[in-house]
Amino acid sequence: RGGMLISPRHFRELCSPSYREIASVARDCGVPMAAVDSDGNTMELIPLLVECGVNALFPFEVKPGNDLFALRRRFPEFVLMGWLEKETLNEGNESAIRGELTAKVPGLLASGRYFPNGDHGIQPLATFPSLCRFLTLLHELTGNPEGEFPRTPPG
C-alpha cells in the first residue's frame, strides 16, 4: 500500500512498452481515456503512466496517502476517479460523510476531469441508509437534479 511494487526503472523496462501500445491503440480508435486500476499509494506511478500515454487512474485509495489535489496541480489533464473514503459509508455517520464529500468533491469537480466515487467498492458493513445519505449529498454537490435517495418508482 505504501508505493510501487517495482522500481520506476523496472516499470519503464517491463511495463511501459505494453502500456504505451494499449494507450496508442485506444487513441487510434478514438477512445479519449486510457485508464488503469491500481491500489495503494499511486503518487509515484502517475508520472510513469503519463509517460506511456495513460491519462486516467482509479480508485485512488485514501488511507495509503494519495493526494488528488496535489496530483491535479501537477497533472491538470489527467482524469482522476475515486478518492472518497469507503470507511465513511461503513461508519454511517452523517457528519463524517458530509465532511469527506464537501472537503474533496467541490474543489476537484471545479478543476475538471474528476469522477467522484468511492476509493473502492462498497463494503458489506455499509448500510442502505448510509449509502442513501452518501448518494443524496453527492448528487447535491454535483448539481444532479435526480437528487434524493432512496428513490421510489412513480405510480
Task: Locate each region found by the language model.
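Active-site loop segments of alpha/beta catalytic cores
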Residues: 1-155
